A protein has these predicted regions:
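Core catalytic alpha/beta fold that binds nucleotide/phospho-ligands
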Residues: 1-144
Length: 144
């Protein structure tokens, strides 16, 4: 059986645009990796989508913004344009400690907003039917 954790975030593109105008270098270097910046430049809608993806990933990992650094989560497309998540440092350690087997990311944006949804997958070992039957029999015996 597979269990899921989901993170969702919505970002106002205008907010990212204002951050770029007021704190361009500090904001960019604190939040985005060099590869993300090469890909997106100063295009606020692309950076807002990546910002939302990082927030959604932190939620799916259960860490919040204080648990991992922004640049420990990287969002880059594959050759077909599908966004992929790359985890480093504490973000990667957290995913491994949770036993995550995959992270799936979806990005979308309109004129005013960018949003991201992250689904974290965790494979649970299949039930052992004999062990489950044994557990049930013990419970039934205890009831009598």
């Amino acid at each position: 059986m597979t269990s899921l954790a989901v993170g969702v975030d919505l970002v106002e593109i205008g907010r990212v645009h204002r951050l770029l105008q007021r704190h361009r270098d500090r904001f960019r270097s604190r939040v985005f990796t060099p590869a993300e910046l090469r890909l997106c430049g100063d295009r606020a809608h692309l950076l807002a989508a990546r910002f939302a993806a990082k927030e959604a990933t932190m939620k799916a990992l259960g860490t919040g913004a204080r648990g991992v650094a922004w640049r420990e989560i990287e969002v880059l497309p594959n050759r077909r344009g599908k966004p992929l998540l790359f985890l480093y440092g504490r973000a990667k350690e957290r995913a491994q400690s949770l036993g995550l087997t995959g992270l799936d990311l979806s990005l979308s944006h309109s004129r005013d907003f960018a949003m991201a949804t992250v689904v974290a997958l965790q494979e649970e070992p299949p039930d052992d039917p004999q062990a489950e039957r044994g557990w049930l029999m013990e419970r039934l015996d205890a009831i009598r």
